[in-house]
Amino acid sequence: DLWQFGQMMNDVMREYVVFNYLYYGCYCGWGGIGKPRDATDRCCFVHDCCYGKVTGCNPKTDSYTYTYSEENGDVVCGGDDLCKKQICECDRVAATCFRDNKDTYDTKYWLYGAKNCQEESEPC
């Protein structure tokens, strides 16, 4: 679920970052349109696409299990439910993407607003 995604982001980035990404660019937050503005926004675009491929459960509300290793920074998705594992994998890839692209985060894209994202969306 989205709360777990926020927790995972905080784990992987080793700081409280959820609100920095909630309304970032054209794709971070609820939904998305237009073209991703930078590598950070592309993490959200890919995450949205990943959620769009999940069938049989709701990525925004269904919870899953995962473990986080502080030693090596890895997230491992657990549980027996394949659909929930898919949600977890979408979140794991996005959280890792945010960490790996932290240097691209640009405050000018925080609270960017959909009015600035009017181009045609690219396909997943």
Swiss-Prot record:
Keywords: Calcium, Disulfide bond, Hemostasis impairing toxin, Hydrolase, Lipid degradation, Lipid metabolism, Metal-binding, Platelet aggregation inhibiting toxin, Secreted, Toxin. One of its GO terms (cellular component) is extracellular region. Binds 1 Ca(2+) ion. GO terms for biological process: arachidonate secretion; lipid catabolic process; negative regulation of T cell proliferation; phospholipid metabolic process. Ca(2+) binds at residues 27, 29, 31, 48. Its EC number is 3.1.1.4. Expressed by the venom gland. The keyword Disulfide bond applies. It comes from the Eukaryota. Its cofactor is Ca(2+). The active site is at 47, 89. Disulfide bonds join 26-117, 28-44, 43-97, 49-124, 50-90, 57-83, 77-88. Belongs to the phospholipase A2 family. Group II subfamily. D49 sub-subfamily. This is Acidic phospholipase A2. It comes from Bothrops jararaca.
